[in-house]
Amino acid sequence: MKTSVLRWVRYRAGQRGAGAEREGKGRSVRARGWVLASFAVLTAGLLVFHRAVPNSVGRTGSLLESFLPWLGLVVVALLVLAALRRSVTALVALVLPAVGWTCLFGGLLLPEAEAGPYDMVVVQHNVSDANRDPVGTARVLAAADADLIALQELVPPATAVYEEALAPRYPYRTVQGTVGLWSKHPLAGVRPVDIKPRGITEDWSRGLRAVVRTPHGDIAAYVAHLPSVRVRAAGLMSSWRDESAGLLGEAVAAEEQTRVILMGDLNSTLDDRGLAPLTSRMNVAKRGFAFSFPASFPVARIDQIMARSATVGRIRALSRTGSDHLPVVARITLR
């Protein structure tokens, strides 16, 4: 009798222990689900309200915006973890960042509209002052058969190589400082554009403006190379770039020609608020990511093509050259 009672007591104790263990595991799974859901909501907040992230400390907002599309990978990682945890809470919460990312960047994946009768093709490329293969670089650029080619970091003797290699297809050209423009159409009104920040004291010429005489009317073309940014322990160092972008924006705003095309290494992505003086005044590509830097493993597009009174079609990267940037090409539909 005593033996039976002891067995019954042990059995009940085992049942209570197993129940407590199952309850503990359930709580742990639910807790992990809420943690994943919290990260999902945070990611959605960064995507939708990235402009609210302050720039006062280390330009944190600009740093986030430079890599904003890559938050899509965070969404994918959270989705995998939520599926492994079988957390309905996390999966539901992930709808928020998924919708946010799609609204911001989903359109870039859509196909390009058909070419119109008043289109131009333009190429933008920072050829790098350390480029050891200017001949091969010129070959890649010429193969795009663009109407305009904008180049930055032009230094002798490489500049002469580009001039000679591109001359057969591009008889019109201008080089101002370290930036240049090659064109199939005549150029007029060529002049440098002063976009030098006040803190730079040495000789520094990185902007030009020219009027392109196309069969469809005159177009003001701007070529620019904004100062580089650096990521330090204190954050993103971009004050010179931001100042230069402001000067370039003022020049574009004062341009008398109705139609304007801007091509340049702007050392900034389009989402970065540092380019607001330009993106607020000009149209940008709505199709294509075209990450252009670094060429070995592109993670951001800092080479930009913009237009006023014209539409920028799909932007795409060309084959790698001897530069640390990839060339980008886009079709411009004139209005």
Give the predicted meaning of each segment.
Residues Y118, N131-A142, E153-R335:
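Soluble catalytic domains of enzymes that build or remodel membrane lipids, polysaccharides, and related
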Residues K2-E163:
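N-terminal, active-site-proximal structural segment of metallo-dependent hydrolase catalytic domains
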